[in-house]
Amino acid sequence: MRLLKYPLEGISGNVTSLVTIDAEYVVVCGSRGDIQVWHQQQLLDTAFDRCTLETLKPKYSFTFELKDDEDELVFAMGDRDCLYLGTEHSVYSYSGWLKALESGHTTLENKLIYTTVSQSIITDVKWDSLLDILFVLTDRPCKIHLFDTRSANKKEITSIALDKNSKPLTGVVDPSGAGTFTVLTSDRSIVVYHINRTGDYKEVKKLSQHVLVYPLHYKITMPPQADFLPIINSLKGSSGAAGSTATVLLNRNENYKVMSTLVPSASSNTKVLVHSPKMYEKANLKRGTISRYNLVATSTNTDGSIMIWNTKRGKPLFAPLNISDSAINDMIWSSNGLTLFAVSNDNVLYTFAFLQDDLGKTVPMEEIENIRQSNIIKEPLPIAYVITASDGLGDISTSKNQGLGVAADNSSNILSTDTNTNEKNLSTVNTTEPQTNSQSSSYNNKPESKLDSSKSEITSADSSDEKAKNLEARPIEAKSKKILNGKNLESKSSSVTTSDNIQKKVEDSKSNVSVTATEKKTKPDKKSIKSENGESKVNKAQNTISPKESNTTDNKSTTPDFKNPSYQVPKDLKRKPKEDALGNAVTKRAKKDLEPVDFLDTGLLLPNVAFSRVRLSTPLIRMNIDCTSSNDSKILLNIRNGSGNEQKPTIVKLLDKTVTPERTLFQDFIPKFVSLATSGDDFWACSSEDGTLYIFNDVGRKIIPPLTIGVPISFLEACGKYLLCVSSIGELYCWNIASSKLEFPVTTIFPLLSPSIRYSDDILTRAENITMCSVTNNGFPIATLSNGDGYMYDKNMETWLLVSDGWWAYGSQYWDSTNNSNLIPDSSTKPTEGQSSTEISKASIVTLLEKKTNNELTRKGRIKNLRRFARTILMKEGFENIEEIVTLSHLENKLLVTLRLEEQHEFKKLIKLYAVKLGELGYVDRLRDLFAWIISDSNDNGDLIPGINRKELVKTLLTACADLRSVQRVTIDYADMLGYLPNDIFFDCESQNDTGK
């Protein structure tokens, strides 16, 4: 394989799409309308070093004039005859564009096909070259517009209306010509339609909760044999890891079951998925078998990586290629399946040139056609003929100019084929006729399709008595046994042909169409209606007859509308969503049930909350909310919720209850419901139900303009000068109110909820509840879960740290050491400035989290595991020292946490206890490492943390470990190095010599 990376010049904006024209050209389209046509062979020669980069340049170039400066060219497709370009508001066509460029023209004329109205946006444009139908997907309203690209004016033949909540985002075209079109919608559904050339459609399959797509411009293609449907970012068949996505291949012949899964790297969403137009095969010489497979190239919407997969093995051919720092906007294969072209967002054209040995031998198209014939094809759409006759001339035609109308008559009336373009939504039968020399040359450039036409019996009913007067139109039924697999050829011969000549021509052709003429009496309810000039016309309600139901008058889809399912998370972790067979039955309340509490709650349903990875509960709106000051319990913030609007706003008061009667310090009105309130040292904060924060000082002045979070708030806590806010989608904010700044970038609590365990394939499940979420006086967020784990957020490391774990409760000797005598502060300890002795004796944050862990273990009945731990694990062989290892691990974690929290008194006690424990257990190397860590920066006499000097701390530890003989060698070395040995804490050498010792 060779890779050519070529930066494009002369294209303003970003390159958005690629188009290959046979095996000759590749068209590169820029967002600002700059279009370049490159010769594929020149790119391949450059990739294989057969020519230099200096000679590489585009073959042709022209500019697509945008009507609006804000519009961008995002869609492109076509062939040699016509090129279709589209923006998010309009679609245009360039007929004969390549011939004009080859003739030397640089300015081409385009024709408007479709333009949106009001606020509608085009989400995708697809072209079926076999059916000659252009699909335009729009929102507001959600529709699929179908345009006939064979006609000169590219007229719209029909449109498919979708549910207003099912916004079509992208479509997938069937390359086999079987007439299926797949749509991926915003409500995670996949809808498959069966469509014929006249625009008649029928919904054949709808898969709900299958795919997660966003408002992006996706590019998805099917394999050439069209036996499976690729679905990107599927909700089915994923590996279950958090943030992982998968591409699944749905077998169309087995009711769209998952036949294979392609799992890319974690936390990536596929944007481009293109199948090679060829099938490949490799022979296994050892087993004597031949393996056939498809190749598909995928790329994500976040990085510039490209992967090429073998669909048979479900594995990529090679590791992901990170070829660009920006995202890949589009990819396309050459017609021979040996070259892959890609463009990135930074305007670089990539050419992957493969050899035959790299990918495998290509399968001939005849064998691919045989595989297409084996696909299960849906029943054909309803079929009907429209026959019109006039004085002296009988015209037999099918709607939309489809098929060949033939009539047999004994008289000498002249018959011909005609086109009826005014009738819409009429079903037709597809018949074929050998291509004549008089046909348009525009079809000569297209390859002929192998057609399987069904045998039809056409009966023309005439009355011999009425022939002399005029010809009456009669409906003719046609029975079809099989859907045609190719495009029908139109009969455009304008020569006058008699009935005998037409009969002979049909019998000699290879179209297997038998035509018989029989005379029938006209039924009373199918009479023709004569116009004033004598012409005979058929009522529109009578000239459309289904082959199965003759009374069918409209062949549009009759699929009923359904209400979209709810995406709420079930309360039971293992329960699947079930339908309520009894309906909304009223359940009786048990006698001992508590009386319900009335809350003022509007129950907002927000899409960004419903589809978020984290969904936290929010407090219900209460009538009254009281919040006391952290400094003085007599200062009270009282909130009275009104009606949530301007007519009766919410009243916010700050009351001083130290005097009688109570005094109002300030009062404010908020035209919203208030859900939470908190207080700091010198500020008050409250939040509304829609996620707006209001912050006041003690006299009622707003310190900061109202902060808009956008979603309801689940936690609102304050301590000192810091304010903590956790939204219902898991976003965590921490502000320094004194400086009006964000303390650290916005983070999330998603890592705390065990996403790798709690993510399910089918539905989201509930994680552990968050029992506490607060902030320390130094601005460190802390959180506890219902399983007993406690965490703190390190703003320097920008990640969550584990503080307390239930595992340490089982094995550590110093777990929940509130009453441990070694940790009680000495009486000689003096409080620092601004800190009382009462605060020193209080339990630290680590001890608080350990208490919460104990409470959760007790609540869940897991305390009994402590006895089981001592009775079973400690007595097993190989686990004799597990208790001391768990104890040291617990002490080390507490040391590191208190160091980051800057709790100097707790840190002193813990490090002293830790050093003594190391000495008692004989961990000499670890004790030596502890001393080295403390004095590693002692030359500048700096503090380890504010208030703790490094040398003084080492002196304290040396004194505590002086009586431990097993570590005296370490303590003496460090005491001598720091100058404590001769005159301070150990012994006096001179006094010992005088006494003779």
UniProtKB/Swiss-Prot annotation:
Keyword Transmembrane helix carried by entry: no
Biased composition (Polar residues): 409-446, 491-501, 539-567
Pfam families registered for this protein in UniProt: Hira
Keyword Transmembrane helix: no
GO molecular function, a single term: transcription corepressor activity
A single GO cellular-component term on record: nucleus
UniProt biased composition (Basic and acidic residues): 464-480, 518-538
Stored SUPFAM superfamilies: DPP6 N-terminal domain-like, WD40 repeat-like
Keyword entries, A-Z: Chromatin regulator, Nucleus, Repeat, Repressor, Transcription, Transcription regulation, WD repeat
Subcellular locations according to the entry: Nucleus
Function comment: Required for replication-independent chromatin assembly and for the periodic repression of histone gene transcription during the cell cycle.
Protein name according to UniProt: Protein HIR2
Source species: Candida glabrata (strain ATCC 2001 / BCRC 20586 / JCM 3761 / NBRC 0622 / NRRL Y-65 / CBS 138)
